[in-house]
Amino acid sequence: MAKRHVIFVVGSTATGKSEWALKLAQEFNGVIVNCDSVQLYKKLDIGSAKPSKAEQALVPHYLLDYVNPPEEMTAGNYCRDFYAILEEIPADKPVFVVGGTGFYFMAIEKGMYPVIPVPVEIQAQVALELETEEGAIRLHAEMMKADPEYGAKIHLADRYRIGRAIELIRSQGKSVTQIQAEFESQRKPFPFPLLKIGPSWDREVLRERIGQRVEKMLAAGLIEEVQGLLDEGLASWAPISSVGYKETLEYLRGGISLSQLQEEITTNTHQLAKRQRTWFQRDKDIQWFDGASGFAEVRTVVEKFLKP
Protein backbone atom coordinates (compact mmCIF):
# COMPACT_ATOMS: atom_id res chain seq x y z
CA MET A 1 0.00 0.00 0.00
CA ALA A 2 1.35 3.43 -0.96
CA LYS A 3 2.56 5.57 1.91
CA ARG A 4 1.48 9.18 1.76
CA HIS A 5 4.30 11.71 1.43
CA VAL A 6 3.95 15.34 2.50
CA ILE A 7 6.20 18.20 1.40
CA PHE A 8 6.05 21.58 3.12
CA VAL A 9 7.03 24.40 0.74
CA VAL A 10 7.57 27.34 3.07
CA GLY A 11 9.04 30.82 3.14
CA SER A 12 8.43 34.53 3.27
CA THR A 13 6.04 36.32 0.99
CA ALA A 14 7.24 36.95 -2.59
CA THR A 15 9.91 34.23 -2.51
CA GLY A 16 8.34 32.15 -5.29
CA LYS A 17 7.29 29.19 -3.17
CA SER A 18 3.92 28.88 -4.92
CA GLU A 19 5.65 28.65 -8.30
CA TRP A 20 7.94 25.93 -6.97
CA ALA A 21 5.03 23.99 -5.49
CA LEU A 22 3.10 24.19 -8.75
CA LYS A 23 6.04 22.92 -10.82
CA LEU A 24 6.76 20.10 -8.38
CA ALA A 25 3.12 19.04 -8.11
CA GLN A 26 2.86 18.91 -11.90
CA GLU A 27 6.05 16.91 -12.31
CA PHE A 28 5.38 14.41 -9.53
CA ASN A 29 1.62 14.06 -10.07
CA GLY A 30 0.82 15.65 -6.74
CA VAL A 31 -1.71 18.02 -5.24
CA ILE A 32 -1.37 21.38 -3.54
CA VAL A 33 -2.81 22.27 -0.14
CA ASN A 34 -2.81 25.97 0.68
CA CYS A 35 -1.28 27.05 3.98
CA ASP A 36 -1.72 30.80 3.64
CA SER A 37 -4.19 32.24 6.13
CA VAL A 38 -5.48 34.86 3.66
CA GLN A 39 -5.66 32.75 0.50
CA LEU A 40 -8.11 30.54 2.38
CA TYR A 41 -10.80 33.13 1.75
CA LYS A 42 -12.94 33.74 -1.28
CA LYS A 43 -12.93 37.30 -2.67
CA LEU A 44 -9.37 37.93 -1.41
CA ASP A 45 -7.51 37.26 -4.65
CA ILE A 46 -5.25 40.12 -5.71
CA GLY A 47 -4.09 41.27 -2.29
CA SER A 48 -3.24 37.72 -1.21
CA ALA A 49 -1.33 36.91 -4.44
CA LYS A 50 -3.59 33.90 -4.87
CA PRO A 51 -2.70 31.56 -7.77
CA SER A 52 -4.68 32.39 -10.90
CA LYS A 53 -7.58 30.24 -12.05
CA ALA A 54 -5.37 28.98 -14.89
CA GLU A 55 -2.69 27.92 -12.41
CA GLN A 56 -5.25 26.30 -10.13
CA ALA A 57 -6.50 24.26 -13.10
CA LEU A 58 -3.08 22.66 -13.63
CA VAL A 59 -3.19 20.54 -10.46
CA PRO A 60 -5.82 20.00 -7.75
CA HIS A 61 -5.75 22.72 -5.07
CA TYR A 62 -7.26 22.36 -1.59
CA LEU A 63 -8.03 24.87 1.17
CA LEU A 64 -7.85 27.66 -1.40
CA ASP A 65 -10.92 29.84 -1.96
CA TYR A 66 -12.27 27.74 0.87
CA VAL A 67 -14.04 30.10 3.27
CA ASN A 68 -16.92 32.40 2.33
CA PRO A 69 -17.09 35.88 3.86
CA PRO A 70 -18.00 36.92 6.48
CA GLU A 71 -16.93 33.59 8.01
CA GLU A 72 -13.49 33.37 9.60
CA MET A 73 -11.03 30.50 10.01
CA THR A 74 -9.07 29.63 13.13
CA ALA A 75 -5.83 27.67 13.23
CA GLY A 76 -7.68 24.89 15.02
CA ASN A 77 -10.29 24.66 12.27
CA TYR A 78 -7.59 24.76 9.62
CA CYS A 79 -5.79 21.86 11.29
CA ARG A 80 -9.01 19.85 11.53
CA ASP A 81 -9.91 20.45 7.89
CA PHE A 82 -6.38 19.74 6.70
CA TYR A 83 -6.51 16.20 8.05
CA ALA A 84 -10.07 15.68 6.81
CA ILE A 85 -9.00 16.69 3.30
CA LEU A 86 -6.02 14.34 3.37
CA GLU A 87 -8.52 11.50 3.64
CA GLU A 88 -9.94 12.54 0.25
CA ILE A 89 -6.56 12.56 -1.52
CA PRO A 90 -5.23 9.25 -2.91
CA ALA A 91 -2.29 8.07 -0.80
CA ASP A 92 -0.01 7.72 -3.82
CA LYS A 93 -0.25 11.44 -4.64
CA PRO A 94 2.39 13.59 -2.94
CA VAL A 95 0.89 16.49 -1.02
CA PHE A 96 2.64 19.84 -1.42
CA VAL A 97 1.59 22.15 1.42
CA VAL A 98 2.52 25.69 0.44
CA GLY A 99 2.29 29.02 2.23
CA GLY A 100 3.84 31.46 4.64
CA THR A 101 1.64 31.05 7.72
CA GLY A 102 4.10 29.41 10.07
CA PHE A 103 1.62 28.93 12.89
CA TYR A 104 -0.62 26.83 10.64
CA PHE A 105 2.32 24.67 9.56
CA MET A 106 3.23 24.13 13.20
CA ALA A 107 -0.37 23.24 14.05
CA ILE A 108 -0.64 20.50 11.43
CA GLU A 109 2.79 19.08 12.20
CA LYS A 110 2.82 19.24 15.99
CA GLY A 111 -0.77 19.77 17.06
CA MET A 112 -2.23 22.60 19.11
CA TYR A 113 -2.67 23.15 22.80
CA PRO A 114 -6.29 22.43 23.69
CA VAL A 115 -8.60 25.36 24.37
CA ILE A 116 -9.46 24.89 28.04
CA PRO A 117 -12.81 26.39 29.04
CA VAL A 118 -12.82 28.64 32.09
CA PRO A 119 -15.98 29.43 34.09
CA VAL A 120 -17.38 32.85 33.26
CA GLU A 121 -17.28 33.98 36.88
CA ILE A 122 -13.53 33.32 37.09
CA GLN A 123 -12.95 35.17 33.82
CA ALA A 124 -14.94 38.13 35.12
CA GLN A 125 -13.10 38.22 38.45
CA VAL A 126 -9.67 38.07 36.80
CA ALA A 127 -10.64 40.79 34.30
CA LEU A 128 -11.81 43.00 37.17
CA GLU A 129 -8.55 42.53 39.07
CA LEU A 130 -6.51 43.34 35.95
CA GLU A 131 -8.19 46.72 35.51
CA THR A 132 -5.84 48.40 37.98
CA GLU A 133 -2.05 48.50 38.15
CA GLU A 134 -2.15 47.19 41.72
CA GLY A 135 -4.36 44.29 40.65
CA ALA A 136 -2.06 43.37 37.78
CA ILE A 137 0.93 43.39 40.15
CA ARG A 138 -0.90 41.09 42.59
CA LEU A 139 -1.89 38.67 39.82
CA HIS A 140 1.65 38.67 38.45
CA ALA A 141 2.91 37.76 41.93
CA GLU A 142 0.26 35.02 42.20
CA MET A 143 1.38 33.63 38.85
CA MET A 144 5.07 33.73 39.87
CA LYS A 145 4.30 31.83 43.08
CA ALA A 146 2.20 29.13 41.36
CA ASP A 147 4.22 28.88 38.15
CA PRO A 148 7.67 30.49 38.43
CA GLU A 149 8.94 28.84 35.23
CA TYR A 150 6.18 30.30 33.05
CA GLY A 151 5.98 33.52 35.05
CA ALA A 152 9.64 34.30 34.39
CA LYS A 153 8.80 34.56 30.68
CA ILE A 154 5.86 36.95 31.11
CA HIS A 155 6.39 40.69 31.47
CA LEU A 156 4.27 42.59 33.96
CA ALA A 157 2.81 44.62 31.08
CA ASP A 158 1.49 41.50 29.32
CA ARG A 159 -1.85 41.48 31.08
CA TYR A 160 -3.46 39.08 28.61
CA ARG A 161 -1.03 36.26 29.39
CA ILE A 162 -1.05 37.03 33.10
CA GLY A 163 -4.84 36.86 33.10
CA ARG A 164 -4.96 33.63 31.12
CA ALA A 165 -2.41 31.98 33.42
CA ILE A 166 -4.38 32.97 36.51
CA GLU A 167 -7.64 31.75 34.95
CA LEU A 168 -6.08 28.32 34.41
CA ILE A 169 -4.46 28.19 37.84
CA ARG A 170 -7.73 29.05 39.58
CA SER A 171 -10.04 26.93 37.42
CA GLN A 172 -7.88 23.87 36.78
CA GLY A 173 -5.65 23.81 39.83
CA LYS A 174 -2.72 23.47 37.42
CA SER A 175 -0.04 25.80 36.18
CA VAL A 176 0.50 26.64 32.53
CA THR A 177 3.80 24.74 32.74
CA GLN A 178 1.98 21.61 33.97
CA ILE A 179 -0.68 21.87 31.25
CA GLN A 180 1.97 22.29 28.56
CA ALA A 181 3.97 19.34 29.90
CA GLU A 182 0.87 17.12 29.84
CA PHE A 183 0.20 18.11 26.24
CA GLU A 184 3.80 17.45 25.21
CA SER A 185 3.73 13.99 26.82
CA GLN A 186 0.68 13.07 24.72
CA ARG A 187 1.85 14.70 21.49
CA LYS A 188 1.92 12.28 18.59
CA PRO A 189 4.52 12.47 15.82
CA PHE A 190 3.49 13.67 12.37
CA PRO A 191 1.89 10.59 10.79
CA PHE A 192 3.51 10.76 7.33
CA PRO A 193 6.99 11.04 5.82
CA LEU A 194 7.70 14.78 5.77
CA LEU A 195 10.11 16.95 3.78
CA LYS A 196 10.43 20.70 4.37
CA ILE A 197 11.87 22.95 1.67
CA GLY A 198 11.87 26.64 0.83
CA PRO A 199 13.34 29.23 -1.55
CA SER A 200 15.80 31.71 -0.09
CA TRP A 201 16.75 35.14 -1.45
CA ASP A 202 19.23 37.85 -0.61
CA ARG A 203 17.33 40.48 1.38
CA GLU A 204 17.88 43.25 -1.13
CA VAL A 205 16.68 41.05 -3.98
CA LEU A 206 13.61 40.09 -1.96
CA ARG A 207 12.99 43.78 -1.31
CA GLU A 208 12.94 44.38 -5.06
CA ARG A 209 10.63 41.42 -5.62
CA ILE A 210 8.22 42.75 -3.01
CA GLY A 211 8.20 46.18 -4.64
CA GLN A 212 7.46 44.65 -8.02
CA ARG A 213 4.67 42.53 -6.55
CA VAL A 214 2.98 45.53 -4.94
CA GLU A 215 3.10 47.41 -8.25
CA LYS A 216 1.49 44.45 -10.01
CA MET A 217 -1.23 44.14 -7.36
CA LEU A 218 -2.23 47.77 -7.74
CA ALA A 219 -2.18 47.51 -11.53
CA ALA A 220 -4.28 44.33 -11.36
CA GLY A 221 -7.07 46.07 -9.43
CA LEU A 222 -6.37 45.77 -5.70
CA ILE A 223 -8.19 49.03 -4.99
CA GLU A 224 -11.26 47.83 -6.88
CA GLU A 225 -11.11 44.49 -5.06
CA VAL A 226 -11.20 46.20 -1.67
CA GLN A 227 -13.93 48.62 -2.81
CA GLY A 228 -16.02 45.59 -3.75
CA LEU A 229 -15.58 44.19 -0.24
CA LEU A 230 -16.68 47.51 1.24
CA ASP A 231 -19.72 47.55 -1.02
CA GLU A 232 -20.69 44.16 0.43
CA GLY A 233 -20.46 45.49 3.98
CA LEU A 234 -17.27 43.60 4.85
CA ALA A 235 -15.23 46.51 6.23
CA SER A 236 -14.94 44.88 9.67
CA TRP A 237 -14.21 41.37 8.34
CA ALA A 238 -11.02 40.27 10.13
CA PRO A 239 -9.04 39.12 7.04
CA ILE A 240 -9.19 42.68 5.70
CA SER A 241 -6.77 43.64 8.47
CA SER A 242 -4.03 41.72 6.62
CA VAL A 243 -1.22 43.46 4.75
CA GLY A 244 -2.34 44.96 1.45
CA TYR A 245 -5.99 45.15 2.43
CA LYS A 246 -5.77 47.33 5.53
CA GLU A 247 -3.68 49.95 3.72
CA THR A 248 -6.05 50.00 0.75
CA LEU A 249 -8.96 50.40 3.14
CA GLU A 250 -7.22 53.41 4.65
CA TYR A 251 -6.70 54.87 1.16
CA LEU A 252 -10.36 54.43 0.25
CA ARG A 253 -11.35 56.21 3.45
CA GLY A 254 -9.20 59.17 2.46
CA GLY A 255 -6.51 58.61 5.05
CA ILE A 256 -3.56 58.33 2.66
CA SER A 257 -2.70 59.22 -0.94
CA LEU A 258 -2.14 56.76 -3.78
CA SER A 259 1.64 57.12 -3.56
CA GLN A 260 1.48 56.61 0.20
CA LEU A 261 -0.65 53.52 -0.37
CA GLN A 262 2.02 51.85 -2.49
CA GLU A 263 4.73 52.87 -0.03
CA GLU A 264 2.83 51.60 3.01
CA ILE A 265 1.95 48.24 1.46
CA THR A 266 5.58 47.79 0.41
CA THR A 267 6.95 48.71 3.85
CA ASN A 268 4.46 46.52 5.72
CA THR A 269 5.11 43.61 3.36
CA HIS A 270 8.84 43.91 4.11
CA GLN A 271 8.04 43.74 7.82
CA LEU A 272 5.78 40.72 7.27
CA ALA A 273 8.54 38.97 5.31
CA LYS A 274 10.98 39.62 8.14
CA ARG A 275 8.60 38.09 10.70
CA GLN A 276 8.01 35.08 8.47
CA ARG A 277 11.73 34.60 7.93
CA THR A 278 12.36 34.75 11.68
CA TRP A 279 9.64 32.15 12.32
CA PHE A 280 10.84 29.66 9.72
CA GLN A 281 14.53 30.02 10.59
CA ARG A 282 13.77 28.53 13.99
CA ASP A 283 12.89 25.24 12.27
CA LYS A 284 16.20 23.51 11.58
CA ASP A 285 14.50 20.77 9.55
CA ILE A 286 13.76 23.14 6.65
CA GLN A 287 16.14 22.79 3.71
CA TRP A 288 16.72 26.15 2.01
CA PHE A 289 17.63 26.54 -1.65
CA ASP A 290 18.61 29.52 -3.76
CA GLY A 291 15.40 31.10 -5.02
CA ALA A 292 16.91 32.06 -8.37
CA SER A 293 18.94 28.97 -9.27
CA GLY A 294 18.06 26.23 -6.81
CA PHE A 295 15.03 24.60 -8.41
CA ALA A 296 16.97 21.81 -10.15
CA GLU A 297 18.50 20.86 -6.81
CA VAL A 298 15.09 21.00 -5.13
CA ARG A 299 13.65 18.74 -7.78
CA THR A 300 16.38 16.15 -7.13
CA VAL A 301 15.78 16.28 -3.36
CA VAL A 302 12.02 15.81 -3.82
CA GLU A 303 12.53 12.97 -6.29
CA LYS A 304 14.78 11.15 -3.82
CA PHE A 305 12.28 11.74 -0.99
CA LEU A 306 9.42 10.26 -3.03
CA LYS A 307 11.28 7.12 -4.08
CA PRO A 308 9.79 3.99 -2.51
From Swiss-Prot:
Binding positions (ATP): G11, S12, T13, A14, T15, G16, K17, S18
Entry keyword tRNA processing: yes
Recite the UniProt keywords alphabetically.
ATP-binding, Magnesium, Nucleotide-binding, Transferase, tRNA processing
Give yes or no: UniProt keyword Ribonucleoprotein.
Answer: no
Per the record, the GO terms for biological process are: tRNA modification
InterPro entries in alphabetical order: Dimethylallyltransferase (IPR039657), IPT (IPR018022), P-loop_NTPase (IPR027417)
Family the UniProt entry places it in = Belongs to the IPP transferase family.
* Function per UniProt: Catalyzes the transfer of a dimethylallyl group onto the adenine at position 37 in tRNAs that read codons beginning with uridine, leading to the formation of N6-(dimethylallyl)adenosine (i(6)A).
Identify this protein by name: tRNA dimethylallyltransferase
**Organism per entry:** Bdellovibrio bacteriovorus (strain ATCC 15356 / DSM 50701 / NCIMB 9529 / HD100)
The protein's gene is named miaA
